[in-house]
Regions:
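Histidine-centered active-site loop/cap adjacent to the catalytic His
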Residues: 152-184
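Loop/turn elements at helix/coil->beta-strand transitions in domains of secreted/extracellular proteins
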Residues: 28-33, 55-58, 88-92, 132-135
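The substrate-binding groove and active-site-proximal loops of carbohydrate-active enzymes
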Residues: 63-69, 107-113, 152-156
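Active-site segments of SGNH/GDSL-like serine hydrolases
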Residues: 60-62, 84-115, 138-147
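Serine-esterase "nucleophile elbow" of acetyl-processing enzymes
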Residues: 1-37, 41, 45-55
Length: 184
C-alpha cells in the first residue's frame, strides 16, 4: 500500500499508468496499491486505522507534501504506531517530500519543504528510539533531477519526473523489500 498526495496519485502524469506505483507494479509483478489523496495525505488517525485494516506486505508513506511541519511532528508517531499495532512485522517505508521547483522563486515554499523534510526525519528518529522495527527512511536525493524539466508546474512530476523518481525509489525499495524489478 502506497499512501500519499497528488504527487503519488499521478496528478500530472500523461496517463494513470505513468504514476510511480503503477510502474512499480508492472516492473515487479507485485500490486502497489495507489492511495494518493490529492491534497489530503495528512496522516490523520482515521486514515491510519483504515490503512491498518488492509492486509499489506508493506506500507509506503509518501505523504509528506501535504501536512504542515507541525502536523508531521504531531501525527507521525501515532500514525506509524497505529499501523504497527495490526502489522507488527510489516515493513513501513517513509519517504521525504521531493524538492519543488517552486522553491527556486518562492522562498516561503522552499522553507516549508525544508521544514517538512526535517520534521519527518526527526519523527522517524523518534520512532527508531522507541525501537520500532522494520521502519525505513528514504531521504530526498534530487528525486526530480537538477535540470528543472521534471514537473509540469514546479510541484507535480511529469513523465520525466516520474522516471527519475522511479529510478531512485526502485533502488531503495528493492533493497528493503528484496524485490527484483524488471526494466521497463
Amino acid at each position: 500500500v502506497v499512501y500519499g498526495s497528488s504527487i503519488l496519485q499521478g496528478a500530472s502524469a500523461s496517463r494513470p499508468g505513468m504514476a510511480y506505483p503503477a510502474r512499480l507494479s508492472r516492473s515487479s509483478g507485485y500490486n502497489f496499491i495507489n492511495l494518493g489523496l490529492s491534497g489530503n495525505g495528512k496522516m490523520e488517525k482515521e486514515v491510519a486505522e483504515m490503512l491498518a485494516d488492509i492486509d499489506a506486505d508493506a506500507f509506503i508513506l509518501d505523504c509528506i507534501p501535504n501536512p504542515s511541519p507541525k502536523e508531521i511532528t504531531d501525527r507521525t508517531v501515532d500514525f506509524v504506531m497505529t499501523l504497527r499495532q495490526k502489522h507488527p512485522d510489516t515493513p513501513i517505508i517513509v519517504i521525504q517530500t521531493l524538492i519543488r521547483e517552486t522553491g527556486n522563486f518562492n522562498q516561503k515554499a522552499r522553507e516549508n519543504v525544508k521544514r517538512q523534510n526535517e520534521a519527518i526525519a526527526e519523527q522517524v528518529e523518534v520512532l527508531r528510539k522507541k525501537n520500532v522495527k522494520n521502519l525505513y527512511f528514504i531521504k530526498e536525493d534530487q528525486f526530480l533531477g537538477t535540470d528543472h524539466e521534471g514537473t509540469v508546474d514546479g510541484t507535480h512530476p511529469n513523465d520525466l519526473g516520474f522516471d527519475r523518481m522511479l529510478k531512485k525509489y526502485k533502488l531503495a525499495i528493492s533493497k528493503i523489500l528484496k524485490i527484483k524489478f524488471k526494466a521497463e
